[in-house]
Design a protein with these regions (language model features):
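A structural motif corresponding to the C-terminal end of an alpha-helix
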Residues: 19, 50-63, 87, 129-137
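Core AdoMet radical
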Residues: 1-10, 16-49, 61-71, 93-110
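Radical SAM enzyme core and accessory elements
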Residues: 123, 127-191
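Flexible glycine/acidic-rich beta-alpha junction loops that bind and position SAM and/or redox cofactors
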Residues: 69-75, 92-126, 139-140, 144-147
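Short secondary-structure boundary/capping segments
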Residues: 40-43, 79-84, 115
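Catalytic cores of alpha/beta
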Residues: 71-88
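Enzymes that process phosphate groups on RNA ends and nucleotide/triphosphate substrates
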Residues: 29, 47-51, 116-122
Length: 191
């Protein structure tokens, strides 16, 4: 099962736990208002509440949070990882892991649109988190994230302009402002 868990109910957990095994991947891309921006319609309070339901799944279930790392959240993943670390420990969610996947398609969301000096600052904020998570896989993911942030691949031509236009249209339709949520990206969106 892969879900954003907004419609997750206890009855789902009770049913799923009857299976011999299974997996649940939960999409959380950023911390609080950043996640609500990226996953429009998301509500952080409901996400946290429903995440606690996974505690009722037996250890025969693999559980993880998956973060899609992109332009918007590439510099603030430390916020999400800090929250994750605290949340799983405070709520005894010992079976919940964290993983990430870089967004490479569509090209307009690639992290390479964020200037390297901003990504290097993000790496510095991630370094103290290596080794602090409760499982080996999650800790390895932080190292992979830092390596990913150093990418010098070139996005396809025109994809930066697509990013700017896409974000402008989203902000108009949603009555939002990308820079209110991600002020550190001023250099990207005010270019």
């Amino acid at each position: 099962v892969h879900t954003n868990i907004h419609s997750l109910r206890e009855r789902h957990i009770e049913l799923w736990d009857q299976f011999k095994s299974g997996w649940i991947g939960i999409s959380i891309d950023a911390y609080r208002e950043e996640n609500d921006y990226i996953r429009y319609g998301s509500r952080w309070d409901l996400l946290e509440k429903n995440l606690l339901l996974t505690k009722k799944l037996g250890s025969h279930w693999s559980q993880w949070i998956t973060s899609s790392v992109m332009v918007f959240n590439s510099c603030t993943m430390h916020r999400l990882i800090n929250w994750f670390n605290e949340f799983v420990r405070n709520n005894n969610l010992k079976d919940l892991k964290w993983r990430m996947d870089p967004v490479t398609n569509p090209n307009l969301m690639r992290i390479e649109h964020v200037p390297m000096h901003l990504r290097e600052e993000a790496i510095e904020k991630l370094k103290p988190l290596v080794g602090t998570l409760q499982d080996k896989m999650s800790n390895e993911m932080i190292s992979i994230l830092m390596k990913t942030l150093r990418s010098v691949e070139k996005p396809t031509e025109g994809s930066f302009e697509e990013l700017i236009e896409y974000t402008r249209v989203l902000d108009i339709k949603r009555k939002q402002n990308v820079l209110k949520v991600f002020p550190h990206l001023k250099e990207v969106f005010d270019a």
